[in-house]
Amino acid sequence: GCKKDRKPCSYHADCCNCCLSGICAPSTNWILPGCSTSTFT
């Protein structure tokens, strides 16, 4: 899944976005738009 490279999501727009709920969704996901791009921890 996402974050297998363990780098901040903001570095990989083509990988995933980190939602506040802790869900890591694909940046191309139109179901969960507007997710934050902060570091996923």
UniProtKB/Swiss-Prot annotation:
PTM annotation: Position 41 corresponds to a L-threonine, and not a D-threonine as firstly supposed.
Record's keyword annotation contains Ligase: no
Transmembrane portions of the chain: none
Protein source organism: Conus radiatus
Function of the protein: Iota-conotoxins bind to voltage-gated sodium channels (Nav) and act as agonists by shifting the voltage-dependence of activation to more hyperpolarized levels. Both natural (L-Thr form) and synthetic (D-Thr form) peptides cause paralysis and death following intracranial injection and grooming and hypersensitivity upon intraperitoneal injection into mice. The L-Thr form of the peptide is 7-fold more potent than the D-Thr form. Both natural peptide (L-Thr form) and synthetic peptide (D-Thr form) are active on nerve, and on muscle.
Gene3D superfamilies attached to this UniProt entry: 4.10.40.80
Protein's UniProt name: Iota-conotoxin-like r11d
Annotated localization: Secreted
Family, as annotated: Belongs to the conotoxin I1 superfamily.
Bridged cysteine pairs (disulfide): 2-16, 9-19, 15-24, 18-35
Assigned keywords, A-Z: Disulfide bond, Hydroxylation, Ion channel impairing toxin, Neurotoxin, Secreted, Toxin, Voltage-gated sodium channel impairing toxin
Free-text tissue specificity from the UniProt record: Expressed by the venom duct.
Entry's Gene Ontology molecular function annotations: sodium channel regulator activity; toxin activity
GO cellular component entries: extracellular region
Domain characteristics, as noted in the entry: The cysteine framework is XI (C-C-CC-CC-C-C).
Residues found modified as 4-hydroxyproline: 8, 26
Pfam families xrefs: Toxin_19
